[in-house]
């Protein structure tokens, strides 16, 4: 299966990461010698050569634009700038329907090790026919933000926990019970969203993901490696530490 374009969602304000995001968009937070966004761009270029890269920007978009101007003109990502953020579901739907391509969508607050990213791409490349793919990892039911239901590798549905459910203690049984949870990356097969009409300012999950799942065309790809959703100080500092180790291990230069 060929990925034609990559869309990195980086329009959010990163409110839970203040004061780090007072003067920087979340995707530009430093990771030692690189930053969150640049890490995703470099991995995309390395493991998916030839795929065009798009970045959705809004909050402090000028700083993201300035950052990508460091790339040579022929390799420079395209910016999808939204003065008034549309929300991930509408942005992704518009991009997929305008390009009519196989699109890899990545949340711009994700840190993947090189090994994890390469394994995901390998799973995509092994697909003989075009299909939609959701990257998922296993977590305890108590800690999971989303719960993915699958049958024989085909995703049936996804549900999101409410803020109340996330803060409540669910007890010992939920700590030991493992569930599949979304890892912040999805491949959307061409023409999958033609008749999908999302509301403004909503996330990809659950509505967009369930729309694709209802067609029985959404495969689960297991994420067993290092991946961090950077949405608070603890996760950010963990990503900084892991990024330093990853750069040494793979001798990467940014």
What are these regions (language model features)?
Residues 104, 111, 118-125, 139, ...:
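Catalytic-core segments of class I nucleotidyltransferases/pyrophosphorylases
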Residues 6-11, 27-30:
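A conserved hydrophobic helix/loop-capping motif in glycosyltransferases and polysaccharide synthases
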Residues 23-38:
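Short catalytic helix/loop segments, enriched in acidic residues and glycine
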Residues 1-8, 16, 34-108, 112, ...:
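Conserved N-terminal catalytic core of the sugar/cofactor nucleotidyltransferase
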Residues 50, 100, 128-131, 216:
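Short, high-confidence coil segments that cap the C-terminus of an alpha-helix
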Residues 59, 132-149:
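Short beta-strand-to-loop element that shapes/binds the nucleotide-sugar donor at the catalytic cleft/hinge
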Residues 56-58, 80-83, 134, 161, ...:
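Conserved beta-strand termini and adjacent loop/short-helix elements that scaffold enzyme active sites
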Residues 30, 135, 148, 187-189, ...:
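Short, well-ordered beta-strand micro-motif
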């Amino acid at each position: 299966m060929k990925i034609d374009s990559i869309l990195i969602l980086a329009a959010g304000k990163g409110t839970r990461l203040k004061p780090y995001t007072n003067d920087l968009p979340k995707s530009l937070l430093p990771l030692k010698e690189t930053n969150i966004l640049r890490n995703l761009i470099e991995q995309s270029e390395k493991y998916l050569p030839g795929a065009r890269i798009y970045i959705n920007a809004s909050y402090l978009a000028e700083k993201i634009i300035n950052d990508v101007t460091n790339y040579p003109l022929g390799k420079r990502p395209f910016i999808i700038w939204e003065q008034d953020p549309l929300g991930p579901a509408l942005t992704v739907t518009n991009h997929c329907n305008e390009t009519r391509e196989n699109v890899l969508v990545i949340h711009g607050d994700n840190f993947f090790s090189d090994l994890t990213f390469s394994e995901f791409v390998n799973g995509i490349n092994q697909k003989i026919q075009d299909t939609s793919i959701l990257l998922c990892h296993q977590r305890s039911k108590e800690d999971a933000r989303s719960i993915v239901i699958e049958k024989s590798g085909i995703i049936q549905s996804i549900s999101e926990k409410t803020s109340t459910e996330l803060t409540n203690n669910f007890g010992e049984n939920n700590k030991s019970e493992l569930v599949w949870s979304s890892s912040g990356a999805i491949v959307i097969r061409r023409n999958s969203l033609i008749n999908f009409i999302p509301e403004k300012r909503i996330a990809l999950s659950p509505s967009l993901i369930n729309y694709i799942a209802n067609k029985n065309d959404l495969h689960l790809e297991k994420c067993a490696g290092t991946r961090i959703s950077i949405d608070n100080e603890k996760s950010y500092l963990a990503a900084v530490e892991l990024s330093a180790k990853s750069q040494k291990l793979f001798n990467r230069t940014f």
